[in-house]
Structure formats: C-alpha cells, structure tokens
C-alpha cells in the first residue's frame, strides 16, 4: 500500500517518521486513546477502515483489536491544521485501552 501523495505532502512527521493519532468514539464523543501512526498505518486505515497504528516499542504496525478483539471501525479521518495530528472517529468494540477500560483516560482525574 502507498499513501496518496497529496495526503503524504500535508503530513508533518517527527524525526522517526511518525505523527500522532487521536481516537474519538463516534456518538459519545469520548476521546478513547492517543497513538502513533506512520504513512503505511494511515494508508492501511484509509483503505480498510480498520484502525492501524505504529508501535514504537515493537517497531511495527498493529491493527487495533487483531489479538484482543477490541476493534475500531473507522468512520472518518481528519488532519489538524498543523498536519502533525490526525483525528480518527471510530466505532469501538470492547475497551479501547490495553487495560480493558473503555478509554485510556478512565484513570486518575488530575483536576
């Protein structure tokens, strides 16, 4: 797969070729998680509607829910004004967080 050159030209990546993905639940508007993507992960997401991210610790792509069954069906992908973050709007099946929580922001409230 190859990311559309027009999309690729708008992205601003970090030194590792990655950019941030914010994931929001369709319907509730809950922010579910923040992850990293590379061009190939975004391309796969756009073509399959399966949320695909890049694991910095493993150095590889991963499809959300491939092992856990907690999948994300992608309804929309939007690029922010700076080009360094994408916003995915998804239908979440199961918990979005690796802890099993609905969102990665269900833990300690700081304020």
UniProtKB/Swiss-Prot annotation:
What note does UniProt attach to the cofactor annotation? Binds 1 Mg(2+) ion per subunit. Binds 1 zinc ion per subunit.
Q: Which GO terms describe its cellular component?
A: cytoplasm
- Required co-factors: Mg(2+); Zn(2+)
S-S pairs: none
Q: Which EC numbers characterise this protein's activity in its record? A: 3.5.4.19
Per the record, the domain of life is Bacteria
Q: In which pathway does it act?
A: Amino-acid biosynthesis; L-histidine biosynthesis; L-histidine from 5-phospho-alpha-D-ribose 1-diphosphate: step 3/9
The record lists Zn(2+) as bound by: 81, 97, 104
The compartments listed are: Cytoplasm
What name does this protein carry? Phosphoribosyl-AMP cyclohydrolase
Task: Please tell me the species this chain comes from.
Answer: Mycobacterium ulcerans (strain Agy99)
Question: Which gene is the coding source of this polypeptide chain?
Answer: hisI
């Amino acid at each position: 797969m190859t990311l559309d050159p027009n999309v690729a030209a708008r992205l601003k990546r970090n030194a590792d070729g990655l950019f941030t993905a914010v994931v929001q639940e369709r319907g509730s508007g809950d922010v579910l998680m923040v992850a990293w993507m590379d061009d190939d992960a975004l391309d796969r997401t756009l073509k399959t509607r399966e949320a695909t991210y890049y694991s910095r610790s493993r150095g590889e792509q991963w499809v959300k829910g491939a092992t856990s069954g907690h999948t994300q069906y992608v309804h929309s992908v939007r690029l922010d004004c700076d080009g360094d973050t994408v916003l995915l709007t998804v239908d979440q099946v199961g918990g979005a967080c690796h802890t099993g929580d609905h969102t990665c922001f269900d833990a300690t409230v700081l304020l």
